[in-house]
């Protein structure tokens, strides 16, 4: 009986102490399940328990991989 009371007290008091590390992940670990999305987040799916899967919005622009290196010797013209 003492063990039961001890475990109950531990789980009861640790339940509110959850942080973002223990949040349920969604969208292949890029998103997080929460009740509402932040300003810079976008709703992309629904999680269990009526939660929303929110992903941080990426800024528009060119990726570094898309830019051509001028020193690479690559020319678009023939000859």
Curated annotation (Swiss-Prot):
One of its GO terms (biological process) is innate immune response. InterPro entries: Beta_defensin_dom (IPR025933). Coiled coil: none annotated. GO terms for cellular component: membrane; microvesicle; nucleus. It is found in: Secreted. Disulfide bonds join 26-53, 33-47, 37-54. Gene3D superfamilies: Antimicrobial Peptide, Beta-defensin 2, Chain A (3.10.360.10). Keywords: Antibiotic, Antimicrobial, Defensin, Disulfide bond, Secreted, Signal. Has antibacterial activity. This is Beta-defensin 15.
